[in-house]
Amino acid sequence: MRPQYKDVNDKLDSTAKHKTNSHGGRYDNPYVHITSPTSASDKRSKDKVLEVLNRCGKKVEDATRKAEALVGGLKDHLKFSPSISDAAMARLSQGTKMIVEGGPERVFQREFGVLAVEKLLDSFVCYISTTSGPVTGVIYISNRRIAFCSDYAIRLPSSAGGNGVAAYYKVVMEWEKISSISSSTNVLKPSERYVHMVTRDGFEFWFMGFVSYIDAFNCLNKALLNSRCNHAM
């Protein structure tokens, strides 16, 4: 039976604290990777964003129209952010980044490299639960693994106090490491749906705020099933 939680946020917090404690920017969780951005690459990215916004107004308009068709999913996505304006800007920045880089496959390859005979199946905008709150980004689903990367560098807590360092939050799991993927719903707010992943060594991850929840959940389960079938052959 899939879990149904009266207060999913309590469950998210307890799970995150149990398995993703930070120690000065380093994480006990072997699937979490922290990548510090370089000022040069950030400047190039900003320059490219401005260039695309200036040259590709039509593409941005087309993308906006498509987004409006998913208004329900977008509302569910944006409400997980403490700032709707920040979430909207993150989505615009991510969409522009995809145009600049030539699509999600190239972004995936640049951020995570490529494994042998790996093929990207799909990617979805979502949030991941962390001890610091929901982090917006994109989850990439390939035939070999799932990978998440935050849209922008976030401030990570420091054991010495202070503001900590700004870094990209990434999660990478190969399919053979994943034990289960399930769906859960906040019974007090049925529109809030979550994807719960558990690894074979007991680590848990919660993803939420999908613009296309059903498509994402089905894609994840199909990829997990195909991976198990391939390993059984």
UniProtKB/Swiss-Prot annotation:
Domain of life where this protein originates: Eukaryota
Domain GRAM: start-end pairs: 106-185
UniProt xrefs under InterPro entries: GEM-like, GRAM, PH-like_dom_sf
Ranges of Basic and acidic residues composition bias in the record: 1-16
UniProt region (Disordered), positions on chain: 1-45
A Pfam family the protein falls into: GRAM
SMART domains: GRAM
Annotated family: Belongs to the GEM family.
Identification of the protein by name: GEM-like protein 2
